[in-house]
């Protein structure tokens, strides 16, 4: 049984002191894959300091960790640090589009929809993911660029988007036309 598994067992027993000892041991003895799984789980249950330590340790080799670190920093209200983590993901990385989307979310949180739109537009140039186009349409609707929003909503499969987001693109197109 790995130290990560022992830590999780200690958490189930609500023995936090023992869980902490196993956590410290896991950092030095468990495989990177085990640590990534542990970090993801710890993040999901709100053990952010421990998840952060693992992600920081593994981030140079696992760029997706920077996205998790940015989410933790954002949840802590440290948007500057969240942006710094996302800047670590370079344009050639498989995770670059995800970093752009995370940046767009952060800019939206900061009340900067124009900058958020720029990041989404950059992501849309790199992927044909429908949710990226949907995000662009939503921001264009918010910014009052109804003609552009209509074009973007029209590219999407209403059923698929509705299943993923609960939003009807048909309804959004209607709102845009009514606002022209």
Listing of model-derived features with the role each one plays in the protein:
Residues 29, 58-61, 91-92, 125-126, ...:
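Structural marker of alpha-solenoid helical repeat scaffolds
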Residues 37, 68-71, 102, 135, ...:
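Canonical tetratricopeptide repeat
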Residues 1, 33, 64-67, 98, ...:
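Start-of-helix register in tetratricopeptide repeats
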Residues 12, 44-45, 75-76, 109-110, ...:
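Register position in tetratricopeptide repeats
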